[in-house]
């Protein structure tokens, strides 16, 4: 067993988007701890980045993939949230959230696939429990993550045709400690109370940790999960068990 749990990623190369964010950064660390090579990508100028990549840019994806000789895994971790119900969500915000969360995931799957199918591989898309059950005050975010989950299933079914296959799964966290939760809370009158309420709503009584999500991603990238594809995997402290 490695430091990343049951994951063994020796000799595997994994591209991680959103690598400057809390979850993306933790995924990069988990891949490296499990023996793999992580290529950290995010917007130009972000810290700890190997490759500058705007996930909404088709040209950026083409350029990034062209520079990689071998790819065994992809983690689409880039994402943003916008706190607003359907009446308060303006169209520009809607387009921006879907562009990063859903279009970015689509482009990643599309352009990385040719490299992955050469020897088989795994894609992990960051969805959310709010893509499974919805949320009244995150209209654009829930729509984007619901799209990510169904895109994942389509890619998984296509990837299963290849021998060896290209697996594709979605990780669905509840609220996780980090800038995104801080941003959601900051849009309210009492951020501290809101964060505490988010934690109390979880049966296990706390928010998730980026490292916990990253460990699950590492497992889904590894050969230990070879019979798992097309799945929405909640990591939510029991939130969706209700």
Model-derived features: where do they sit?
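Residue(s) in the substrate-gating loop at a strand-loop-helix junction
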Residues: 128
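Active-site helix of classical SDR
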Residues: 109, 144, 152
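Substrate-binding pocket helix/loop in short-chain dehydrogenase/reductase
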Residues: 85-86, 93-98, 194, 198
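Short, small/polar-rich loop/turn modules that mediate ligand/substrate recognition or access, typified
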Residues: 160-167, 228-230
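C-terminal helical subdomain
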Residues: 170, 192-224, 228, 237
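Short C-terminal tail/terminal secondary-structure segment
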Residues: 2-5, 133, 218, 229-242
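Alpha-helical segment proximal to the catalytic Tyr-Lys
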Residues: 114, 157-161, 226
């Amino acid at each position: 067993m490695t430091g990343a749990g049951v994951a063994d990623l020796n000799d595997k190369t994994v591209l991680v988007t959103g690598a400057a964010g809390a979850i993306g950064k933790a995924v990069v660390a988990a891949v490296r701890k499990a023996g793999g090579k992580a290529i950290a990508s995010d917007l130009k100028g972000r810290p700890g980045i190997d490759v500058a990549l705007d996930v909404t840019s088709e040209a950026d994806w083409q350029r990034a993939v062209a520079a990689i000789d071998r790819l065994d895994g992809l983690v689409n971790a880039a994402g943003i949230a916008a706190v607003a119900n359907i009446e308060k969500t303006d169209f520009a915000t809607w387009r921006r959230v879907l562009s990063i969360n859903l279009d970015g995931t689509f482009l990643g799957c599309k352009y990385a696939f040719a490299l992955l199918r050469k020897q088989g591989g795994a894609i992990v898309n960051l969805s959310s429990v709010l893509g499974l059950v919805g949320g009244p005050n995150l209209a654009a975010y829930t729509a984007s993550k619901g799209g990510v989950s169904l895109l994942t299933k389509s890619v998984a079914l296509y990837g299963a045709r290849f021998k060896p296959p290209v697996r594709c799964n979605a990780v669905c966290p509840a609220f996780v400690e980090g800038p995104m939760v801080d941003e959601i809370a900051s849009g309210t009158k009492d951020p501290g109370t809101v964060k505490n309420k988010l934690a109390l709503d979880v049966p296990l009584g706390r928010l998730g940790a980026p490292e916990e999500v990253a460990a699950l991603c590492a497992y889904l990238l590894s050969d230990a999960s070879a019979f798992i594809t097309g799945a929405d995997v909640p990591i939510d402290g029991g939130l969706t068990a209700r």
